[in-house]
Amino acid sequence: MEKKCFFTGHRGLGADFDRQKAYELIKILNEKCGVDTFVCGGAVGFDIEMGELVLKLKEEHSSVKLWLFLPCLNQDAKWNYTDKARRQALIDRADYIDCPQVYYDSTVMKTRNYKMVDTCFYGISYFNGKRVSGTAQTLRYAKRQGRKIFNLAKEGNDAINGL
């Protein structure tokens, strides 16, 4: 558990999202904290961005692993072509894939998110302070479980403490 980190974040990323800062954080977790497995939900937005950065880090450090926790096989059914292609690229290069269901239902996202938290000690989020969201729900659960969370969204840093 101590060597794993999950990602949780919003689909829409704000102008404050900094890919380089995000990359540096996963690199520090790998090199300084020994994190070797990064767990990604494979969703549009933050998940795909972070999954791609893990693959970049993997080019430098072959011990790094990408673990996809997909909520269901048809997760991308309503996505545009570009987002589907980016998700497929993650699937093609992932070291591990968990996908408990074929079809979407009202429980798959929460189940996936909690399983990611249960598997990891660290978490990286992009949380903008919106308290009614899957990201907020996941972060509340992670806090109750005692996980160490790093937030990349500037406007959500104060809000994360109030969850």
Region roles according to the model:
Residues 1-163:
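Acidic/glycine-enriched connector segments
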